[in-house]
From Swiss-Prot:
<dbReference type="GO" id="GO:0003723">
    <property type="term" value="F:RNA binding"/>
</dbReference>
<comment type="subunit">
    <text>Homotrimer. Homomultimer. Homomultimerizes and binds to viral genomic RNA to form the nucleocapsid. Interacts with host MAP1LC3B; this interaction participates to the protection of Gn from virus-triggered autophagy. Interacts with host SNAP29; this interaction participates to the protection of glycoprotein N from virus-triggered autophagy. Interacts (via N-terminus) with host RPS19; this interaction probably mediates the loading of the 40S ribosomal subunit on viral capped mRNA during N-mediated translation initiation.</text>
</comment>
<keyword id="KW-0687">Ribonucleoprotein</keyword>
<feature type="region of interest" description="Homomultimerization">
    <location>
        <begin position="1"/>
        <end position="79"/>
    </location>
</feature>
<feature type="coiled-coil region">
    <location>
        <begin position="4"/>
        <end position="71"/>
    </location>
</feature>
<feature type="region of interest" description="Interaction with host UBE2I/UBC9">
    <location>
        <begin position="188"/>
        <end position="191"/>
    </location>
</feature>
<dbReference type="GO" id="GO:0004519">
    <property type="term" value="F:endonuclease activity"/>
</dbReference>
<dbReference type="GO" id="GO:0019013">
    <property type="term" value="C:viral nucleocapsid"/>
</dbReference>
<keyword id="KW-0694">RNA-binding</keyword>
<keyword id="KW-0143">Chaperone</keyword>
<keyword id="KW-0378">Hydrolase</keyword>
<dbReference type="GO" id="GO:0044177">
    <property type="term" value="C:host cell Golgi apparatus"/>
</dbReference>
<keyword id="KW-1040">Host Golgi apparatus</keyword>
<feature type="region of interest" description="Interaction with host DAXX">
    <location>
        <begin position="372"/>
        <end position="428"/>
    </location>
</feature>
<feature type="short sequence motif" description="YxxL">
    <location>
        <begin position="178"/>
        <end position="181"/>
    </location>
</feature>
<feature type="region of interest" description="RdRP binding">
    <location>
        <begin position="1"/>
        <end position="50"/>
    </location>
</feature>
<keyword id="KW-0540">Nuclease</keyword>
Length: 428
């Protein structure tokens, strides 16, 4: 390991070399200005590379020097025979050893991790773009979301399309749509758009357009979303007209409508109206002015399509429509149910099976309630009792091969593998 003097001498030497290299770089830049031939350009590039390498090395040496000085200070500090740090408040040594020092200087308490998004500014930003680039980005982050996120994790990507541009001095320049691809350690700003936030706001603003283009996330596809929405108006009308077990039965047949799910939803709408937040109301008003397909009743042809791309919470534009946040929770439960079925039928230890289970519902519930509204669990129960069995019967469980066909194919595989090798055949 280098001594303190060696590192200091190294720093002095590199600083001298850097001064010389920078002077040579300036000379090369002047030479290119006077005669921009290939030789001068090549010399300029090599001079830049040399300066960059020296700056990098100098930075490393300075960090090494700082570490050595810190280590010397630590070594010279008197060690308490009790093993307790000088600023520790304990009178007796803890059974736990001292761990890492966590530096929190970089954390901004005004914008903590996991905060509620600024939906108004996010919504207005998205509304400022042409519809084609929004729908194409939605397709890339839902239908092809897994691949896009995997390839770009930890970066801030830009979507580009001919439909999105701005004119500067009469010249068209591309206007990019920015989306951040965070890692688990990333801290997102309130107005920063992540894939989850983008799917949430885009589906909430343009459900009719999502329906017209049949953009469905694979996560929703495997729980039979396409089948579920096929006769949506007929399905929701039958549901709203059904008898509600949470309302008292009416003695007069003429008042039967007062004991239906529709009557319960009307009461729920009055409760929701009292929970409205001004920012989201402003966003809804602006969205209507910008021709977004906003709806005020769950019994609308495109209402269910706000969940087509598996948003991680109820879109803010549908938050104040009775039954909509609960419908998203119903879909989240279906995702958990399917994953539980898949985990149950898989081979492995109980711990391995538990890892394959999911918590979509808990995540959805937490994120939606952070927007200022409490979900009505009774409505989720109504959805599950009316549509649960049918939905489960239309899950895609990834095992569509007939058992006899599988057995026959496996036999042929076994025979061929034994003919050409002495290895054990794999299972189909």
């Amino acid at each position: 390991m280098s001594t303190l003097k060696e590192v200091q001498d190294n720093i002095t030497l590199h600083e001298q070399q850097l001064v010389t290299a920078r002077q040579k770089l300036k000379d090369a830049e002047r030479a290119v200005e006077l005669d921009p031939d290939d030789v001068n350009k090549s010399t300029l590039q090599s001079r830049r590379a040399a300066v960059s390498a020296l700056e990098t090395k100098l930075g490393e040496l300075k960090r090494e020097l700082a570490d050595l000085i810190a280590a010397q200070k630590l070594a010279s500090k008197p060690v308490d025979p009790t093993g307790i740090e000088p600023d520790d408040h304990l009178k007796e040594k803890s059974s736990l050893r001292y761990g890492n020092v966590l530096d929190v200087n970089s954390i901004d308490l005004e914008e903590p991790s996991g905060q509620t998004a600024d939906w108004k500014s996010i919504g207005l930003y998205i509304l400022s773009f042409a519809l084609p680039i929004i729908l194409k980005a939605l397709y890339m982050l839902s239908t092809r979301g897994r691949q896009t996120i995997k390839e770009n994790k930890g970066t801030r990507i830009r979507f580009k399309d001919d439909s999105s541009y701005e004119e500067v001095n009469g010249i068209r320049k591309p206007r990019h749509l920015y989306v951040s691809m965070p890692t688990a350690q990333s801290t997102m700003k309130a107005d920063e758009i992540t894939p989850g936030r983008f799917r949430t706001i885009a589906c909430g603003l343009f459900p009719a357009q999502v329906k017209a283009r049949n953009i469905i996330s694979p996560v929703m596809g495997v729980i039979g979303f396409s089948f579920f929405v096929k006769d949506w108006m007929e399905r929701i009308d039958d549901f709203l007209a059904a008898r509600c077990p949470f309302l008292p039965e009416q003695k007069d047949p003429r008042d039967a409508a007062l004991a239906t799910n529709r009557a319960y939803f009307i009461t729920r709408q009055l409760q929701v109206d009292e929970s409205k937040v001004s920012d989201i109301e402003d966003l809804i008003a602006d969205a209507r002015a910008e021709s977004a397909t906003i709806f005020a009743d769950i019994a609308t042809p495109h209402s269910v399509w706000v969940f087509a791309c598996a948003p991680d919470r109820c879109p803010p534009t549908a938050l104040y429509v009775a039954g909509m946040p609960e419908l998203g929770a119903f879909f989240a439960i279906l995702q958990d149910m399917r994953n539980t079925i898949m985990a149950s039928k898989s081979v492995g230890t109980s711990e391995e099976k538990l890892k394959k289970k999911s918590a979509f519902y808990q995540s959805y519930l937490r994120r939606t309630q952070s927007m200022g509204i409490q979900l009505d669990q009774k409505i989720i129960i109504l959805y599950m009792s009316h549509w649960g069995r049918e939905a489960v019967n239309h899950f895609h469980l990834g095992d569509d091969m007939d058992p006899e066909l599988r057995e026959l194919a496996q036999t042929l595989v076994d025979i061929k593998v034994r003919e050409i090798s002495n290895q054990e055949p794999l299972k189909l």
